[in-house]
């Protein structure tokens, strides 16, 4: 087995690969696709970005493909129902933004857009020169298509054709860039093998495929969402603090997989994490989360996240800016009430209204134990009320029950 493939296998990030890849000698070019279904990349895309970076470090020539054409069709992989089609202008705008993002994260990597070749193919040419090489029987047994065909909603011809378009991408890159390997998440295996078969039918030679595991929880659901929605790599959509807190809140048993897929730590460092996570999962999770955050947002983004995190500890509020409060509120830690409903009211009653405690008995006990905080200061007693001086920047109050359960109250 080639050393680069063995390195991926030792890291336990090989889900599947086609027979013969382990024996390929000489330079290898590999590609991975990113469809512009949104104006930014999300945490799931970071797996692919790290994978391309890792391939480059192992001597493979990486190519990143932006799906300017396939993004207008929609990949049915992993979807229970059909995607809503985006306007052409949206896909174009998204493609430009994602290309810029990939250029920042993957400097020096070749970037291509499949709109450059797919939009040049006429319908007749598509049916005659491409479609005739695909057999319905083979397409219908692909897991993604089979599941959708037998679902209540079914699958449209548009999404059914996605597999053919992705196969043509592989053919185009094989023919024009010498790209013999396509990589992707485990849900892309059917699309990848169809491309390999298409290249063989066109008489170009042997192509290969490789998939890595998706980031999932114990129930097999994709990880990558919070209460407020998708976890984006764009700091304007998901702040560094939100991303950091999201990573810290992931279950301890996901740490080894996160370290393998979302970082560029060496295999030796990964093995060390496997050992340390058994005895000190909190410290290991913080280490891994900070490594990821630094890679995505740089040292300044990491320091911003750590600064806000420190400010939320009891006794530390002064460094929280109005922007920090807004991001905490918008990031799923917020609730809003009219100021008239809060001023002069007992905090004991407000904590119940906001769901931070289950009963007055519970909150009285916590107040006695100095476990209820307003702006990181313990509530003096159960008769304490909300006063104007408790409101930061005219709108915000930071409430906490214990050290971990926190809420930013926005007053209208």
Swiss-Prot record:
Chain ranges for the short sequence motif 'KMSKS' region as given in the UniProt record: 222-226
Residue intervals of the S4 RNA-binding domain: 345-412
Signal peptide: none
Compartments, record wording: Cytoplasm
Example GO biological process: tyrosyl-tRNA aminoacylation
InterPro entries, per the entry: aa-tRNA-synth_Ic, Rossmann-like_a/b/a_fold, S4_RNA-bd, S4_RNA-bd_sf, Tyr-tRNA-ligase, Tyr-tRNA-ligase_bac-type, Tyr-tRNA-ligase_bac_1
The name this protein goes by in its record: Tyrosine--tRNA ligase
The organism of origin for this protein: Chlamydia pneumoniae
Taxonomic lineage: Bacteria, Pseudomonadati, Chlamydiota, Chlamydiia, Chlamydiales
């Amino acid at each position: 087995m080639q050393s680069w493939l063995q390195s991926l296998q030792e890291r336990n990030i090989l889900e599947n690969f086609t027979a013969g890849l382990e024996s390929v000698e000489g330079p290898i070019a590999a590609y991975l696709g990113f469809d512009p279904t949104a104006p930014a990349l999300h945490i799931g895309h970071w797996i692919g970005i790290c994978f391309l970076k890792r391939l480059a470090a192992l001597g493979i020539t990486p190519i990143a493909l932006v799906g300017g054409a396939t993004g207008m069709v929609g990949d049915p992989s992993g979807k229970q129902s059909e995607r809503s089609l985006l306007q052409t202008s949206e896909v174009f705008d998204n493609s430009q933004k994602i290309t810029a993002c990939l250029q920042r994260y993957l400097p020096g990597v070749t970037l291509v857009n499949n709109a450059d070749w797919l939009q040049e193919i006429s319908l007749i040419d598509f049916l005659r020169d491409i479609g005739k090489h695909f057999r319905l029987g083979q397409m219908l047994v692909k897991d993604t298509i089979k599941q959708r065909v037998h679902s209540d909603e079914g699958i449209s011809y548009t999404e059914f054709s996605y597999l053919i378009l992705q196969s043509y991408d592989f053919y185009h890159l094989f023919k024009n860039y010498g790209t013999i390997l396509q990589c992707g998440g485990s849900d892309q295996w059917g699309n990848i093998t169809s491309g390999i078969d298409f290249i063989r039918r066109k008489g170009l030679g042997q192509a290969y495929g490789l998939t890595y595991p998706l980031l999932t929880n114990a129930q097999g659901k994709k990880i990558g969402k919070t209460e407020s929605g998708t976890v984006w790599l764009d700091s304007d959509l998901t702040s560094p603090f939100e991303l950091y807190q999201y990573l810290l809140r992931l279950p301890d048993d996901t740490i080894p997989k996160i370290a393998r897929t979302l970082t560029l730590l060496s295999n030796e460092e990964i093995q060390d994490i496997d050992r340390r996570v058994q005895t000190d999962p909190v410290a290991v999770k913080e280490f891994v989360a900070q490594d990821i955050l630094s890679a995505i947002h740089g040292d300044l983004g990491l320091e911003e996240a750590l600064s806000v995190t420190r400010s939320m500890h009891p006794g530390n509020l002064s460094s929280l800016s109005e922007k920090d409060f807004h991001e905490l509120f918008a990031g799923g830690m917020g609730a809003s009430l009219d100021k008239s409903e809060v001023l002069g009211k007992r905090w004991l009653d407000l904590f119940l209204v906001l769901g931070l405690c289950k009963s007055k008995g519970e909150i009285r006990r916590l107040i006695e134990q100095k476990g209820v905080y307003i702006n990181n200061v313990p509530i003096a007693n159960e008769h304490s009320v909300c006063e104007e001086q408790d409101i930061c920047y005219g709108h915000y109050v930071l409430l906490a029950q214990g050290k971990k359960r926190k809420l930013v109250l926005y007053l209208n």
